[in-house]
Amino acid sequence: MDILQRLMAQLLSSGSSVFVMLSAIVGVMISVAYLVYMERKVIAFMQLRHGPSVVGPFGLLQPFADALKLVTKESIVPLQSRNFAFFIAPVITFTLALSGWAVIPLGASTYVINGVETTIPASIANINLGVLYIFAISSLEVYGIIMAGWSSGSKYAFLGAIRSASQMISYEVSMGLVVLSVAVSAGSLRLVDIVVMRHTMPYWVDLLLLPMAFVFFISILAETNRHPFDLPEAESELVSGYNVEYSSMPFAMFFLGEYANMILVSAMMTIFFLGGWYPPIDVQFLYLIPGFVWFCLKVLLLLFCFIWVRATIPRYRYDQLMRLGWKVFLPFSFVWVMVVSGVLLYLDKLPK
């Protein structure tokens, strides 16, 4: 019995990173599966339809039926494709979509170590440059999409890949400036420090960063190629976009990567602007609810906003999309970073 306890302790210790990473991957995959179910159900409700309702009670087993269908389908390779790049592109996209979750803190516990209060996050890795890590991962995702469009040997796929790359790069600039203003107000690039510092700051700082939160939400819609900025996948123009020649599991990897990115950017916005795992209002009995539950509820709220936007707002033209990014969001974000820094410096509220 003592040996079994020691084995379990070793399995759950920090050294058993493989177990932790596999648990995180399985959790993200299940979340993605039921995000698709949630999207279909919510849009069906808004359009006065039933949505998935046949496979299992209330259609709850529909994601597993869809997964089984994709696994058993034949993978068709176009004659003009470049085989190695064609198959490695979805793997790159899928892997990078999962890699960003390594630094996301789903909660935290506070301990007193050697007389110093220390907050330990519930994340796989707690690195000092967590914000930069996430932005590096999101920037690399462009390569998988470009490889998919180029290697497919299809003009539709190539045009969709070019659109996606230019769109993602354009809005990453605005997102970087938004996160810079958050980092200035928190005084750190560690995600757990950002949540803790933002929680202890006065409410007027949240109001000061509210315009940046709006810019960030619109930017993550464009960054994840979601409606109304889903120009790379515009069915009426490009059939399906950069993944038009993919089927079976390669297509599923692109699909899973897109929805995993949706959850990831929603988690990022929760950390930067919604207080992370803390309750929305500072009332004592709300702290009885675990921080992980608050974090998940806030992420679900943002995912509902993603779905709501898809069901209600028409698609932008490509020139409107680029004009919004370069002529509106970029100058506004740059000016507002200066405003936030100036106000905090003038009122002596910059973190020491």
Swiss-Prot record:
The gene is nuoH. It is found in: Cell inner membrane. This is NADH-quinone oxidoreductase subunit H. PANTHER family: NADH DEHYDROGENASE SUBUNIT 1, NADH-UBIQUINONE OXIDOREDUCTASE CHAIN 1. One of its GO terms (cellular component) is plasma membrane. GO terms for biological process: aerobic respiration. It comes from the Bacteria. NDH-1 shuttles electrons from NADH, via FMN and iron-sulfur (Fe-S) centers, to quinones in the respiratory chain. The immediate electron acceptor for the enzyme in this species is believed to be ubiquinone. Couples the redox reaction to proton translocation (for every two electrons transferred, four hydrogen ions are translocated across the cytoplasmic membrane), and thus conserves the redox energy in a proton gradient. This subunit may bind ubiquinone. InterPro entries: NADH_UbQ_OxRdtase_su1/FPO, NADH_UbQ_OxRdtase_su1_CS. Its main location: membrane. It is a multi-pass membrane protein. One of its GO terms (molecular function) is NADH dehydrogenase activity. It comes from Anaplasma marginale (strain St. Maries).
